Amino acid sequence: VTVSENPMFLRQRLRERLKRARETAGLTQQQVADRFSWSPSKVIRIENGKIGVSVTDAMAMAEAYDLSSEERQELVELARAARRPPWFAPYKGVMTPALEAYIAYEESATIVRAFERNVMPGLFQTEEYARSLLQRIEEDRPAAAEQRVELRIRRQQILSVEETQFFFILDESVLRRTIGSSEIMRQQCETLLRVSELPNVTVYYVPFTAGAYPFFRTPYQVFTFEEGDPVAYLETTAGESLLYEHASGGDRRDPADYLDAFLQVERSGAALPISEDLLFENFTD
C-alpha cells in the first residue's frame, strides 16, 4: 500500500469531495435527496461517513453536482478503490477500531511523527522482540499474540514508501529496557540502527538527564496529510484514542498540541541523534 491508498482514508477523502462538490453546486442535502428519491438521512450519513458510497451513487452524485468528466471519473475511481478490503482484513479479530484507523492514517500520511516511551515503536520491532512483548501481553491468547506479531511485521512495509517522512523521538527508557533477552535486544538495536539510516526516517532519543519534557508520559503519534487536518493517536492506560482538530472530547487537546510538543522537544536540544555506541553499551557480552 502506498501513500493515500488505504480504503478507509479513501472513503474519508471521497465523502469530503462529495460534500465539497455539493456545496460548490449550491445544493442542500434535502435537494440532493429529492433528486434521487432518497431520504435526507442517506445524504447526511454519506457525508459524515456513517455509510459507504456505491460506485453507482458516486456517479449519480457527480452528475448532479455538474462536475467535469475528468472530475467524475476521479470520483468513480475513488469510490471503487474505497470499497476494496484492506490488506489487514485477515487480522481484524485482533484489532480494535482505533488500531484499524491508526493503520489507515499511518499509510495515508505524508509525515508521521511518533513519540515512544518504554518499548520500541512497532515499525522498528524485530519479530523476536515483538513476539516477546506480545506473548506477555496476550498470555492467555497465544494464537492472538502470533497474529499480532504478523500484523506488526507486515505494517513495517510502510517504511519503504519514500514519499512518507517518519520522525521518531524515543525516551531513553526504550533503549534501556530489556525485552526478551540480551541477544534479542542486540538484534533489535541492529535493526533500529539500520532503519534509522533510511533516507525518509529520522530517529532521536531523549536522555534521562533531560528530565521532564512536554507530554513525556504518554506515547503518541501525529499524522499529517497532503489534504485535511492532522490526526493524533494516543496510547494511555485507558486505551487507544484518536484526536481530531476541534473535536470535543475528554482530552480537550487538539492534534496541534501534540505536534507542537513534538517539535518543541525536537528543536530544544533535548532530542539527540542515536549512535551505535549508545545502542549497544547495555547489550554487550
What label would you give each PLM region?
Residues S173:
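Short glycine-rich anion-binding loops that position phosphate/pyrophosphate groups of nucleotides
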Residues T110-F115:
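Internal helix-loop-helix
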Residues Q73-E107:
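Short, charged recognition helix plus adjacent turn
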Residues L170:
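Active-site-proximal binding-pocket segments
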Residues T2-S4, V119, F124-E127, S132-E163, ...:
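Amphipathic alpha-helical interface segments
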Residues V1-P86:
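Basic, Lys/Arg-rich alpha-helical nucleic-acid-recognition elements, primarily the DNA-binding modules
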